[in-house]
Every structure is written in structure tokens, then in C-alpha cells.
Regions:
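Phosphate/oxyanion-binding active-site loops and adjacent basic polyanion-contact surfaces
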Residues: 19, 76, 128-132
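Acidic, polar low-complexity linker/tail segments
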Residues: 3-63, 72-75
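Conserved P-loop NTPase mechanochemical-coupling segment
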Residues: 33, 122-123
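Short, solvent-exposed polar/charged micro-motifs at secondary-structure junctions
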Residues: 46-49, 107-110, 160
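Metalloprotease/metallohydrolase-associated module, dominated by Zn2+-dependent proteases
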Residues: 1-8, 12-16, 125, 134, ...
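VWA/integrin I-like adhesion module and closely mimicked acidic/polar interface patches used
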Residues: 97, 156-193
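Von Willebrand factor
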Residues: 56-113, 117, 122, 134-153, ...
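Short, flexible loop segments at the rims of nucleotide/cofactor-binding pockets, characterized by
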Residues: 42, 124-129
Length: 193
């Protein structure tokens, strides 16, 4: 097959979904929508019927872990924190349990709309090996049960990837295009140009 045709086939077989959009869609899926008579649906007014309207709970509640093992540099940490800020900027109200990890958990904080400026002074800690399991151990010990757990990592765990049954997980992998978690969703971080 000629080279130009091979390139076309490669382009067609390697779909690229914007990983930020994938995360946004995943977070959006956990926002509760419910019916309420507090905001009646106007569509039924002309017929004299009062129908409930949609009540949107725009608060997101997620956990985010930053891999700060020895293979992650300061620039990677800065990129990861910038992406977390980007997630916060998309929503009016949020609660993000944020921490760093290597073989242990460090600097766990809850970031909300009220203290969002704390993210600017957040200090990533770590620098040792990489134990993904430490995240699930910490969540279980601290009774943290997220609807979504987002891990920013380079995708090189020493051991297992974590507990596939505990929570819905998204692995955002930077610098390791071959990484594929055995559960959850794996998205490859690609810097947009």
C-alpha cells in the first residue's frame, strides 16, 4: 500500500477525541437533574396543567489525584494543576477533593467555590515511587466515595492500577501513549496547539 494511503488509513483508525471534552462529559453526567414544582414547566400552562420543571443541581463533587512520583517533573505538576483550574472554571459550584500521591497521599484538600483561590498556592508533594493503590486505600480509610475520580499521571504504576469496583475512574495520562488502564477510562493528555 502506498505511503500516502497508509497515512490516510492511520488517520482514520486513530480517532482523536478531545480529552478535556471527555472529562467534561463525564463530570456533566454526575450532575443531578430532577423534577420540581419550584420551577414549573411553562409548556403545560396553555392547557391549564401545571407540570414540574427541571431542577438542575450544578454542583460537581469529584476527587482528583495528582501523581507526584519521581518520574513527574515540576512542569507536569503545573500542567496538571492548570487542568484542574480549567475544570473549576467550567462550573459555578464545585467541590473537589484534591491530593497528591506517590506511595502515600499528601496535601489532601477540599477545594470549593468559596476557597478556589487556594488552588493557586497548592503545593504538590511527593517524589518517591508510584503506588496507585494508595489512592483507593486513602479514600476507603477516609470514607470518601466519589462519583468520579480523576487521576493525572504518567501511567507507570508500580503494581496495580487500583480498585475497579470502588468508583468511576478516569486516568489522564501524560507522556505515555501506550498506557491503558485495565478499568475506567484512559485518556491521553495531548497539549493543544
Amino acid at each position: 500500500v502506498p505511503g500516502q494511503i497508509q497515512r490516510m488509513i492511520k488517520d482514520l483508525t486513530e480517532p482523536k477525541m478531545n480529552w478535556r471534552e471527555l472529562i467534561r462529559m463525564n463530570i456533566q453526567s454526575i450532575i443531578r437533574n430532577d423534577y420540581s414544582f419550584m420551577r414549573p414547566n411553562r409548556k403545560g400552562w396553555h392547557s391549564g396543567a401545571i407540570l414540574p420543571g427541571m431542577k438542575n443541581d450544578e454542583t460537581i463533587d469529584v476527587c482528583v489525584a495528582i501523581d507526584m512520583s519521581g518520574s513527574i517533573g515540576d512542569e507536569d505538576a503545573k500542567v496538571f494543576l492548570s487542568e484542574i483550574k480549567g475544570i473549576m472554571d467550567q462550573y459555578q459550584d464545585f467541590s473537589i477533593n484534591l491530593w497528591c500521591f506517590d506511595t502515600d497521599i499528601y496535601n489532601a484538600q477540599k477545594i470549593t467555590h468559596d476557597n478556589s483561590e487556594d488552588l493557586l498556592s497548592y503545593e504538590p508533594m511527593g517524589g518517591g515511587g508510584t503506588d496507585f493503590e494508595a489512592n483507593w486505600t486513602w479514600m476507603k480509610e477516609n470514607d470518601v466515595q466519589p462519583k468520579k475520580f480523576i487521576m493525572f499521571t504518567d501511567g507507570y504504576p508500580c503494581g496495580g492500577w487500583g480498585d475497579p469496583d470502588y468508583c468511576d475512574t478516569i486516568f489522564v495520562v501524560k507522556g505515555n501513549k501506550d498506557a491503558e488502564a485495565p478499568f475506567g477510562q484512559t485518556v491521553i493528555y495531548e497539549k493543544e496547539v
